[in-house]
Every structure is written in C-alpha cells, then in structure tokens.
A protein has these predicted regions:
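A short beta-turn/loop motif at secondary-structure boundaries
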Residues: 35-38, 64-66, 103-107
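Short, charged/polar, Gly/Pro-enriched secondary-structure boundary elements
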Residues: 51-58, 68, 118-122
Length: 129
C-alpha cells in the first residue's frame, strides 16, 4: 500500500486562503476536482517529480462547523535544506504562522511547522545536511 492523498479542511469560503498557503506558499499545483465533487467546495493540490509523477497530494475540503487541526498534520519532504529554508521564508513573507522551534528535534531531519490560513498544522522536513 501507499498513500494517495491526505485531506485537511477549511471553513466555508476558505478556499482562497488555502490557495495562498498550499499553492503560493508551499509551491504545490492546484488541480481540478472531479466534476462530481466540485460542487462541495474545497480545492486539491499536487506536487510532481521531474518526470511528472505525483509525489504529494492534499485535498482541502469544506467543513461546517469547522475546527482546525492544530496537532494532527501532514508532513511534506523538501528537496534539501536550502529548499526547506526557502519554503519557510516564503510562508513567513505571505504572513502564515511558521515556527522553527523543533528544527533539530527529529533525529536525521531538519523541519519547521506552519499553519495554513484556516489554522491547520503542516510540517515540512528534509534529511539533515
């Protein structure tokens, strides 16, 4: 088995903030939702390797009432430490809460945690250089 996607949620009309975080901040590509699901709201994002294969997929669904996931979270792997730092800096520039306090607390990795526009926690990590 392998993981196909993870889903996080946002409040109604939270898609634009999701796009700022997942597309503009993390650098993922927004992909169209299947027509049968498009009416539910939300948006989907993917990352691809150089050969065009999907390497990560995050679905942002609309939930009402909404409660952010402040602890449970997806973790995305950056290419290297420079990429990790670049993504973290971009999220800060975009105004998203980002913390490096646990940068060296996971043996063999460097990482940061950020919170999307709805308050959901996301981890970005890379093998320590």
């Amino acid at each position: 088995m392998r993981l196909h996607h993870i889903q996080v949620t946002c409040p109604r009309d939270g898609e634009d903030l999701a796009r700022r975080f997942y597309r503009d901040g993390l650098g993922l590509t927004e992909v169209p939702k299947p027509e049968a699901l498009a009416g539910r709201g939300g948006c989907w994002f993917r990352d691809f390797d150089p050969e065009g294969r999907t390497t990560a997929e995050i679905h942002v669904g609309v939930e009402d009432p909404f409660t952010p996931a402040r602890n449970a979270h997806p973790a995305l792997v950056a290419d290297d430490v420079a990429h990790l730092e670049s993504v973290g800096a971009r999220l800060v520039r975009l105004g998203f809460e980002t913390t490096w306090k646990d940068r060296h607390t996971f043996d063999g990795y460097e990482r940061f945690h950020a919170f999307d526009g709805a308050g959901n926690r996301v981890e970005v990590l890379t093998p320590a250089g």
